[in-house]
Regions:
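Intrinsically disordered, low-complexity regulatory segments enriched in Ser/Thr/Pro
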Residues: 40-100
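Gly/Ala-rich beta-loop-alpha elbow adjacent to hydrolase catalytic centers
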Residues: 321-325, 329
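Cap/lid segment of the alpha/beta-hydrolase catalytic domain
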Residues: 272-294
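Alpha/beta-hydrolase fold nucleophile elbow
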Residues: 312-322
Length: 455
């Protein structure tokens, strides 16, 4: 008994769109078909050991509180009411017995079930595309369809597609998803689900974040109120997230909760804002992308709106970030004229990645290196507020930082020489004491000068 051959026979008989179903065999005993309904999955299978058809809701939608699945189960229960059935208490699974020795009859029954399912769920069914198996597929043909809000994408493996693609020569598909405004919001059953983003309403994405997140000026963020708040001047510390984990959880991917304990050592009256870098595959370091040309303006408006909400003067605002978060901090601090502290920021040295692009930064509208080379020509060299960068000569990012310093001498550079720092990745964790000192000095308006620190 060849279950794979039987499965193909079922697909041939069923009058359904083969691009809207994923077919696989479980444990050499179950024929399984998965359907994607926006951001959640429904599976229909036939178990050879249990001789039963099974209908299962694999996960819950994060955006829709009302699922069509319970109604679908009720419909299936009525259509196949003549067979012995069982439904779980949560109404996320239904089975009915179909004991039949003739596989041709099982194929006919299964193909009919697939047709019934496809018709009932048609309005919510989404494409599931294996871009590795079907290498000639034109992904743009699907992404350009205005009715496509969600799409499932996978390779031959079951790994999260953003990770899988960069290791299997499929990065061009990720660039295409980025440039069309599709972000990964789920991964289940070996399929990564991408959702079309409305670049004028990032608030729509809050469903994928916890209740502690907010949206303002198309920026998603958290706020940590001052532990001590008095009538004296109020301060604002805006923290950029650095690139985080590669998985389907948007919080893990776009938000790193930078400086988690800074509130224990910050001066009173300081609101701490932590921004999520929600764009492209792993964020855009606070810069415009080929899809969204408004990110930089959104962030500048965001900071000004925060100042207005909390009653903070510009001179009492400090922007901060480390590594890729430092990229956004330096850029927005310079163009906005804010006090800034950046820890070993990435300024476009792609040699660090060995000539590869694991973070899909080629989807950024202007290459980062080019952006920072042009920046000195478009900002005021007489910086009203201090911009401080810390780095180490052994860091892979140091040459670009030094070049920016030469183009903008008013930028303050704190250079480290410390045996525990041998490369970029060592820097942030070994300089917490300095970071806290510099941030507090900026908040207190204490002047900082270039320094060469040997430890």
């Amino acid at each position: 008994m060849d279950l794979y051959k039987i499965q193909q026979n079922i697909l041939r008989k069923a009058k359904i769109d083969p691009q809207k179903v994923k077919a696989w065999i479980y444990d050499n005993q179950s024929i399984v078909f998965d359907f994607l309904l926006n951001d959640y999955f429904v599976s229909i299978s036939y178990s050879t050991s249990g001789q039963s058809f099974n209908f299962i809701e694999r996960n819950k939608s994060k955006v829709s509180k009302i699922s069509i699945f319970p109604k679908f189960l009720k419909y299936i229960s009525e259509v196949y009411g003549s067979y012995p059935q069982s439904v779980n208490q949560e109404k996320t699974a239904l089975s009915f017995k179909f004991a039949e020795a003739d596989w041709a009859k099982i194929e006919d029954k299964f193909s009919k079930i697939l047709e019934v399912t496809s018709i009932y769920l048609s309005s919510e069914l989404c494409y599931i595309l294996n871009v590795e198996k079907n290498k000639g597929i034109n992904l743009a043909e699907y992404l350009d369809k205005p009715e496509v809000e969600y799409i499932g994408v996978k390779g031959d493996g079951n790994e999260f597609f953003l990770s899988y693609a960069r290791n299997h020569g499929l990065s061009d598909y990720v660039y295409e998803l980025n440039n069309k405004g599709f972000l990964a919001v789920e991964h289940k059953m070996g399929v990564s689900v991408f959702r079309r983003v409305n670049k004028h309403s990032y608030k729509d994405l809050l469903a994928y974040f916890s209740d502690s997140f907010h949206e303002l000026e198309n920026v998603i963020y958290t706020v940590e109120a001052p532990k001590v708040l008095s009538a004296n001047k109020k301060n604002l510390l805006v923290l950029f997230s650095y690139t985080n984990k590669s998985n389907e959880n948007m919080v893990d991917r776009y938000y790193s909760h930078p400086f988690p304990f800074i509130s224990n050592s910050i001066m009173p009256n300081t609101y701490i804002i932590r921004m999520a870098d929600v764009s492209d595959a792993f964020g855009s370091h606070g810069l415009n992308t080929k899809f969204d040309e408004n990110i930089e303006d959104n962030i500048q408006r965001f900071i000004k709106s925060l100042m207005s909400i909390y009653g903070v003067d510009k001179k009492n605002v400090v922007i901060c970030g480390a590594s890729s978060g430092g990229t956004g901090a330096v850029y927005h601090g310079l163009i906005g004229g804010y006090k800034t502290f950046a820890i070993d920021p990435f300024l476009g040295n792609h040699k660090y990645y060995g000539g590869k692009d694991p973070l899909y930064l080629h989807s950024i509208r202007t290459p980062i290196l080019e952006t920072f080379k042009k920046l000195p020509d478009v900002i005021d060299h007489n910086l009203e507020n201090q911009v401080v960068i810390s780095s180490a000569k052994v860091s892979e990012f140091y040459p670009d930082i030094k070049e920016l310093k030469e183009a903008l001498p008013t930028v303050v550079l704190c250079e480290f020489d410390f045996e525990k720092i041998q490369k970029h990745i060592d820097f942030s964790g070994n300089t917490v004491f300095l970071s806290n000192t510099i941030i507090n000095n900026l908040l207190l308006d204490i002047h900082i000068t270039d320094s060469d620190i040997n430890l």
